[in-house]
Amino acid sequence: MKNRNKALLATLVSLFAISAIAQPNITVLATGGTIAGGGDSATSSSYQAGKVGIDALINAVPETKKIANLSGEQLVNIGSQDMNDQVWLALAKKINQDCDKTDGFVITHGTDTLEETAFFLDLTTQCKKPIVLVGAMRPSTALGADGPLNLYNAVVLATDKSAGERGVLMAMNDKVVQGRNVMKMSTTEVQVFDAVNSGAEGFIHDGKVTYFQAPQPRGDKAAFDVSKLEKLPAVGIVYNYANASAAPVKALREEGGEGIVSAGVGNGNMYKTVFDALAKAAKEDVVVVRSSRVPTGYTTRNAEVDDNLYGFVASERLNPQKARVLLQLALTQTKDPQQIQALFEKY
């Protein structure tokens, strides 16, 4: 009997060990943000982003260890208002280099520029493993902090192999949104992100992922190869409004900008002085993209503005900040407005 019990115990231990080993390996790349923030009061909206390190974040959600083997790496620890090209490039290179070493990636990130990072990574990563961005609207010290559940759900999503067929994703407040479509819609609400022109990809509930939309398979290669890039071309955004000044156009050109995105009114329209300055810039080898400050809809080519005549590019479905990301990458390949227009129609 004792020998039988010992054999049974050994079998159970062996099965437990196999189960633990069989868990997917998820790499957590930390960049800071509110999810890593802390404040002096549990009820105050004042806090400092990027105070908590990745190990502390992971240890604060022990439930994640029941579904995956997590390894964390702190790339930077900043508020995402300070996100920059160097961090983007480091993230893309890291994911591409380590794709075969892990089963998926979770990237902790501030919400301010998360949509830009998500779009950049969607265009520059060739890894077909799940890549999930996650953030929080309340710091870890706040009552009702949303970060822990968001992180847990992001790990759940990263362990779903089929998520790798959907490009870069974001997981927050139980919602799954495609990185190309995600947009921040509120300055303070917990339900902060949406996909205004396409709808959410799915949702996560009780540790399970449900998808609303069919996947759009990624190609074998990234849209843009950034493996040898150390920086991106300089591109700025000019905001349009009643009686707008063209001074920002002049300033961007003096700084050596290779491209300018116009955050236009309506269907990408521009105030006359801004229009004239951008038309002049387009003639002088600066790529000009028309977008709109309106959060939904498309900026259509040759609508009220004759893009063919002035050499402008229409941003299609992209808002100004995402149009800037695509223009930066496009300029690493070409300065031809027609070729760049084709890229905007494709991506």
Predicted regions and their residues:
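Bacterial N-terminal signal peptides that target proteins for export
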Residues: 1-9
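Short Gly/Thr/Asp-enriched flexible loops that form oxyanion-binding sites at enzyme active sites
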Residues: 108-129, 270-279
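Short, acidic/small-residue loops that bind anionic groups at enzyme active sites
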Residues: 118-149, 155-159, 283-292
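C-terminal non-catalytic interaction/assembly regions of soluble proteins
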Residues: 267-347
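Accessory alpha-helical/coil subdomains and C-terminal extensions
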Residues: 24, 29, 53, 57-62, ...
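Internal gly/pro-rich beta-alpha loop/helix module
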Residues: 134-205
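ATP/NTP phosphate-donor binding region
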Residues: 23-96, 276, 280
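N-terminal signal peptide c-region/cleavage motif recognized by signal peptidases
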Residues: 17-19
